[in-house]
Each structure stands twice: as structure tokens, then as C-alpha cells.
């Protein structure tokens, strides 16, 4: 099983690792990685692997988790035409930091605005999808008062400006269940097969189980703007938002 370095240090930009498995010349499993694999509505990290012995670089275009292993999809050969990676090769992993940091800001922002919608409207969060420029939150809500979302945006931005610390904890599922009334805001909850849980606490705001990458404090979000609201039928609603410094003003 790959050691997930991003679990407790989301700011790790580079790391050293050893190649443990190579499939079809382009799917690489390392003993440890800081690359976040696509999951939980958060896209994967990208970046590159640099082989220690000759400096050959391999672009990482996707990372995914399969049976406990995190697989990195790379260009089959080095950008300089070098031979492909082999089991036992020592590599340095380098994360595309701009992409990672954008997703970190989006993910922590999602926790803030989702918590506000839950508390203020009594909504139940049913899904989410992060993007570099815009993210969405899906929720179940019978009475859909669009006018109130301007107030929810204001409350979320007040929380962001208060610069709450964000803490990460890795605990057993039993301990998590003892500490929390629920493991996640998502209605579907967590699989019973999960025995170890990573908790994300925004001090004074919310604490829940989440495996994504997050900021150290809410101030780094800077602010959000709700861009669009959609009625998806019955009680299904969808909200799109962007980071304030990237807001497009879509309606």
C-alpha cells in the first residue's frame, strides 16, 4: 500500500520515493507519494517524476487509487528519449503546485460554504466537484429560496476572513465515530470498509472526515462568490462558486 504523504502535509511540493511497480510502461506505483489521486470530487495532482540516476523526467498526467495503491500515469519514456522507469528506480516527485494549491483553496472553501448551507438552510449535502476555476456543491433542499444565498455567501466570507485554523488528524474509524455525530456532511457517508479516517477540522466551524488536500487556515481562501444556482428537480439543488480573486460573475 502506497504511503500517502499528502494526508498530513498538504504543502509538500517535492518528495523522494522508489518505484515498486510498472504496468504497461506508464502506470507507476511508488512506495510513497505526495501526488493526490482523484477522489472525493477533487481532481488528481499532476507534475513530474525525475529519475535519480540520470535526471530523466517523466510527466505525471494523472494519479488514481486502485486497491490501496496510488498509480501515477506518466509519459512512457522520458522527455529526452530516455528509457522508461523500472522497478527499483529512485525518483524525485515534483507536484504542479499552482494546480494543487488552487484545489486546496477550493476544497477548504467547499467545507466552509457547505457547512453554512447545512446550518442556515437545513440542507443535506449530496455531492461536490472541484474545479480550477469553478466548483459545485449538490444538496437536497425542499424550499429553495435563491435570495437567501446572498446571505449564505456573506456568512461564508466572514468565516473565511476570520482566518480559522485548519487541522488534520488521522484516527481510527471507532475514534472518529466517538468524536463526531457523523463522519461526513455527504449524505451517502463513508464505506464501512474504511477503518482509518482522516479528520479535517476548521476550528470553531466544522470537523468531518475527508481525504482531500486542505489549507492551513481559511484566510488563504481569500473569499468566494456564488456564481450560479440550479434546480435539478424535486429537492435536488446545485450551486456553483468560484474563488473571489477568480470570480467571473456568471449568473
Curated annotation (Swiss-Prot):
The keyword Ligase does not apply. Changing residue 234 to A: Modest reduction in removal of mischarged Ser from Ser-tRNA(Ala). Keywords: Cytoplasm, Metal-binding, Protein biosynthesis, Zinc. SUPFAM superfamilies: ThrRS/AlaRS common domain, Translation proteins. Binds 1 zinc ion per subunit. Its main location: cytoplasm. It is found in: Cytoplasm. GO terms for biological process: alanyl-tRNA aminoacylation. One of its GO terms (cellular component) is cytoplasm. Its cofactor is Zn(2+). The keyword Metal-binding applies. It comes from the Archaea. Zn(2+) binds at residues 107, 111, 210, 214. PROSITE patterns: AA_TRNA_LIGASE_II_ALA. GO terms for molecular function: alanine-tRNA ligase activity; aminoacyl-tRNA deacylase activity; ATP binding; metal ion binding; nucleic acid binding. PANTHER family: ALANYL-TRNA EDITING PROTEIN, ALANYL-TRNA EDITING PROTEIN AARSD1. Functions in trans to edit the amino acid moiety from mischarged Ser-tRNA(Ala). Recognition depends, at least in part, on the acceptor stem of tRNA(Ala). Belongs to the class-II aminoacyl-tRNA synthetase family. Editing domain AlaX-M subfamily. This is Alanyl-tRNA editing protein AlaX-M. It comes from Methanosarcina mazei (strain ATCC BAA-159 / DSM 3647 / Goe1 / Go1 / JCM 11833 / OCM 88). The gene is alaXM.
